[in-house]
Amino acid sequence: CRCVREKPISVELLPFFHHSDSTFRTFSGNAMPTDGDTMLTAATFFDLSSYQHPHLFVDGAYVWTALNGLKRYMNDFAYTLPEDPLLPQGVPLAAPVVLHGGKVLAADGLQIHYGDTTRGGLIVRDSGEILAGATVIMAGAVLLGREIEFGGGVLVESGAMIKAPAIIGEMSEVRQGAYLRGYCLAGRRCILGHATEVKHSIFLDDAKAGHFAYLGDSILGAGTNLGAGTKFANLRFLPGNVTLRINGERIDTGRRKLGAILGDNTQTGCNSVTNPGTILGRNCVLMPNTTAPSGYHSEGTLISPKSY
């Protein structure tokens, strides 16, 4: 997905934060920041203390290097999805199934309460007994590959397509029409929403892309929320790697494709767009119908059209 900025934008800091004046020199994509150049490391953007996959993020390395190691991490993961005739490959499921205790169960005869998945409201009972941590895959969903891992209490709705490899954390929801194109890793209580396409991306816990989004080669921090129609462009028109310009200096990320990285609790408005290599710190806001410029936007930044 390619993007260029079309409208003038205004970048400002929300009043309760301060801008950092740190400077950067030119680095290669896999280099470690030098002494004092720490604003682009994972610790600036995320609290990883309770995340199940913290080893994706190397201490002291640039935050986007987690994407460099994503394929190896997921290729080496020990997947537990059973082989079962009730889970055919590459075709829509003919009937809903339940995953519980390492087994695939036909949903016929089970009682399923479709409450709020991310709050533990998906409840499956067998003759009145709750099957704790049961995951439900509805009829019409498509799984392509066995390297797919579901945590407990996950709901996959009809019409979703999940290509291996994929890891979906507990109490997450893959909604109708979602398209997971491979190497998608979602933490706990995430939403991969209706008509949302995700490719080679990382969701931390409670990250939500609920409606009509595109995420390629991107990272969502904990508690982030994408407004409907948010698009993360990940490929420049010009040849070469995505580069970041910060305080007049240029950083070569070493990546041909790099979408957006959103720090914890950052939000985007409906129909917002980010250019390749947009890095938003914690608690940022990208206003609706706004295109964010590439580069680093520090904690608490508000990005809006000048007309606002």
Can you describe what each PLM-predicted range is?
Residues 55, 190, 273:
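Generic anion/oxyanion-binding catalytic loop in active/binding sites
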Residues 76-80, 84-90, 149-161, 198, ...:
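Short, charge-rich amphipathic segments
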